[in-house]
Swiss-Prot record:
Its main location: cytoplasm. GO terms for cellular component: cytoplasm. GO terms for molecular function: translation elongation factor activity. The keyword Protein biosynthesis applies. Coiled coil: none annotated. CDD domains: UBA_EF-Ts (cd14275). Keywords: Cytoplasm, Elongation factor, Protein biosynthesis. This is Elongation factor Ts. SUPFAM superfamilies: Elongation factor Ts (EF-Ts), dimerisation domain, UBA-like.
Length: 295
């Protein structure tokens, strides 16, 4: 049958695929719209598989809360440009809503779940890959809960390059919980307090500081006292409640939280791409790779 411009337009609107791809799909399927959609999906998924060796180290973090449940997730893309794409923004919101509603235990379980639209999460992401043209990866997520007497603090820095979700216990002051989240985004503490630091890590630091003091030629009788003082600074660097509060450096974070009649139950901080070794291709290689890929 003859393939009309209107048919091509309709298929483009339904799939977001390019004009020539849509025309080819309709020709191959004799104008059957549903089969043409399947054809493009299959083609898109094949493209996605080809991109599997790329490193998706850009992207965004996103936070969603609903009542006493909160979620933070990281969705990776290959370029910062795509992370600003409307399709990417829509996808991350859809994934957040699904994850918060279904509460899968991990990414693997999440990928196999069925979304409200009847598609598997993995399939839904692959369709977005076909439209957007980059590898997209649901890297990680965490679901946290609170009671009616607590508050979530949600903060996205630089539009989602860093995301922090806190739970303030014993206070419903969301502004205070967000202030703590902003501090965590800026300072990046490893632990809530000293109790969370392992004995092994403390002992290792103590040995390093002791050797440091001895190498400085300090008398052995004062080394132990010096080391304890320096350990205090070490704890300030890694423990949230021991740190000077960013919004008011005259008080510790612990004092700020206590001034709200609260305790900090926990926090999750995600920075996009942390721990991922991003491959750096030079421009000439990138052009050559594209030329080879189009053959």
């Amino acid at each position: 049958m003859a393939i009309t411009a209107q048919m091509v337009k309709e298929l483009r609107e339904k799939t977001g695929a390019g004009m020539m791809d849509c025309k080819k799909a309709l020709t191959e399927t004799n104008g059957d719209m549903e089969k043409a959609i399947d054809f493009l999906r299959e083609k898109g998924i094949a493209k996605a598989a080809k991109k599997a060796d790329r490193i998706a180290a850009e992207g965004l973090t996103f936070i969603e809360t609903n009542g006493n449940d909160g979620l933070i997730l990281e969705l990776n893309s290959e370029t910062d440009f795509v992370a600003k794409n409307e399709g990417f923004q829509t996808l991350i919101k859809e994934l957040a809503a699904h994850l918060l509603a279904k509460k899968p235990a991990n990414v693997e379980e999440a990928m196999a779940q069925t979304m409200e639209n009847g598609k598997k999460v993995e399939e839904h992401i692959n369709e977005a890959i076909a439209k957007i043209g980059e590898k997209l990866t649901l890297r990680r997520f965490e679901i946290v809960s609170k009671t009616d007497a607590d508050a979530f603090g949600a903060y996205l820095h630089m539009g989602g390059r860093i995301g922090v979700l806190t739970v303030l216990e014993g206070s419903t002051d969301e502004a205070a919980a967000k202030d703590v989240a902003m501090h965590i985004a800026a300072v990046n503490p490893k632990y809530i307090d000293r109790d969370a630091v392992t004995a092994e890590e403390v002992e290792h630091e103590r040995q390093v500081l002791t050797q440091q003091a001895l190498n400085e030629g300090k008398p052995e009788k004062i080394v132990a006292k010096m080391v304890e003082g320096r350990l205090g600074k070490f704890f300030e660097e890694i423990c949230l409640l021991d740190q000077a509060f960013v919004k008011n450096p005259d008080m510790k974070v612990r004092q700020f939280v206590e001034s709200k009649g609260a305790t900090l139950k926990g926090f999750v901080r995600y920075a996009v791409g942390e721990g991922i070794e991003k491959r750096e291709d030079n421009f000439a290689e990138e052009v050559m790779n594209q030329v080879k890929g189009s053959n």
